[in-house]
Amino acid sequence: MKAVHFGAGNIGRGFIGKLLSDANVAVTFADIDKPLVDQLSHDQSYKVKVVGSQCQVDTVTHVTAVNSASQDVIDRIVHTDLVTTAVGPNVLDIIAKTIATGLAQRFEANNEKSLNIIACENMVRGTTHLKNEVYKHLDEQYHARADALVGFVDSAVDRIVPPSEAANDPLEVTVESFSEWIVDKQQFKGDIPVIEGMEMTDNLMAFVERKLFTLNTGHIMTAYLGALKGHETVRDAIEDNEIREQVKAAMQESGEVLIKRYGFDREVHNAYIEKILGRFANPYLRDEIDRVGRQPIRKLGENDRLIKPLLGTIEYGTENKTLLKGIAAAFMYTNESDPQAVELQTSLKEQGLRPTLAHYTGIDADSKEAKTIETIFLQLS
């Protein structure tokens, strides 16, 4: 079995690429980073350091790489069995045109085998979004064949993969031992590939929101509250008892939405929260606050990790005071090397908190929640 994986970064190599390779899938990474592509195609292997209560170094083999802007990647799409991505939500729209070109040439080559495409991104229904973008670039004459032969499979992914510290080996990547990759089994075309570590569900949104409202919400709360107190890493921040209690409270607030929406068992979900708090405190992972907190505008989107759970608490009339504090802390985040953080701070200076909040999150500037966020923001300032 062959796969083309877009994104040869740390998550691509340390998570999806590794799971595919471990399942004896021949993986071709596609990336724009020429030195990375050159080294991967030369070495055809790399090391993954898995850290937790026990540490081990695994070697991933039988991989290669091509430039994602080249004809090579189009040729691979023509003949592959699977396409996966780990490029970040902002890049999906860019690679959509490449995938569309590959599909058109695949159909012209009369390849009638089914193909499944799975976007492994931190976004809700990311593959469905990718499908819509691909179809914009795919000539209408191919749409019926794509509908019949190409499965666009949504997924939920969870693994903490910080930047690697192996300066002597740029391909080596460090990952936590925990990983979760859940896919919507109803969206596959043809045979569903058997890949250990890829779990099937027919209720994907429950898992997507469980991860978004817990891991992602907790992670970003830790980052923004940690930044306020001058912490440099997620572990430093979560070992601050005051922050830990607030992060836990925020995850419980978002968890109440999940319990009401999907009928999750409260005890089981509380255990999931505790497990995530333990992952944040992993002493073997150096996860920088600025890595987690970057791109605050994206992370303040109405379908992302702070606003979506907040909207759920409004829908169900449940507690949200800690989530509101996290949102206020997001507007306090500064990072001169992050264009989104700079843009957000510029808007705050020019427009003030509530107009900026309304513009970037969609929350009504005159709502009770907006006024509370403003009050907390002024207290934090």
Curated annotation (Swiss-Prot):
NAD(+) binds at A3, V4, H5, F6, G7, A8, G9, N10, I11, G12, R13, G14. SUPFAM superfamilies: 6-phosphogluconate dehydrogenase C-terminal domain-like, NAD(P)-binding Rossmann-fold domains. PROSITE patterns: MANNITOL_DHGENASE. GO terms for molecular function: mannitol-1-phosphate 5-dehydrogenase activity. Its EC number is 1.1.1.17. HAMAP family: Mannitol_dehydrog. Belongs to the mannitol dehydrogenase family. This is Mannitol-1-phosphate 5-dehydrogenase. It comes from Photobacterium profundum (strain SS9). The gene is mtlD.
